[in-house]
A protein has these predicted regions:
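Short, Lys/Arg-rich, polar N-terminal cytosolic tail immediately upstream
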Residues: 1-8
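Structural signature of hydrophobic alpha-helical transmembrane segments
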Residues: 47-59, 114-119
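Mid-bilayer segments of alpha-helical transmembrane spans in multi-pass integral membrane proteins
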Residues: 87, 91-99, 115-135
């Protein structure tokens, strides 16, 4: 019975991760709003030519490696499940935004449709996060890194998370300004 429960949790986590990735894709396509992290990664994508999903995979992998370095022997083996999270989310974003033509070509054609895309994205991300949290196996790699840093250095999670978002937003704005200067 315990194995069936673990399988159910794993499936719930996979559905949640998929929901988050699809939601991020919709939000990115909306052109109106997204997370601080995905905004930063999209700026890097514009500069480097790398796909946003690939950059997300690399960033999440870095987060898992940093967790391992910080926690060392205290690293919970279950957290290795963050690696498929990295891969699944990156692949889904790449498939829906770049690789599968009929999905990549779906874009909002009007301002009201941009809002619809944003709303659908937010709903999918919320649903995905809810499923992932309910599965209670692993968190998103970036969130887990902030948790690890918070515990290690005895700093409030919300302070560190808001600080990280502020850094990503600041970097995004600087990159957008630089991209704008390069195209003038």
């Amino acid at each position: 019975m315990a194995n069936a429960w673990k399988l159910e949790q794993f499936i719930e986590m996979l559905l949640g991760v998929t929901g988050v990735a699809l939601g991020l894709s919709f939000m990115m396509k909306s052109g109106l709003g997204q997370t601080a992290l995905t905004a930063f990664l999209q700026c890097i994508s514009l500069i480097s030519g790398m796909k946003s999903g690939t950059l997300l995979m690399c960033f999440y992998l870095l987060c898992v490696l940093l967790q391992l370095l910080i926690q060392r022997k205290d690293f919970d083996k279950l957290q290795v499940l963050q690696l498929p999270v990295c891969w699944i989310q990156g692949i889904i974003i790449n498939l829906t935004c770049y690789d599968i033509a009929f999905l990549a070509d779906i874009r909002p054609v009007s301002y009201p449709m941009q809002w619809v895309f944003l709303a659908v994205g937010m709903i999918l991300v919320s649903f995905g996060v809810t499923l992932t949290m309910a599965a209670d196996l692993v968190k998103q790699p970036f969130e887990q890194l902030i948790v690890v840093i918070s515990k290690k250095y005895k700093k409030p999670f919300n302070f560190l998370r808001c600080g990280a978002d502020a850094v990503f937003i600041t970097c995004s704005l600087l990159l957008v300004a630089e991209i704008g200067r390069a195209h003038v």
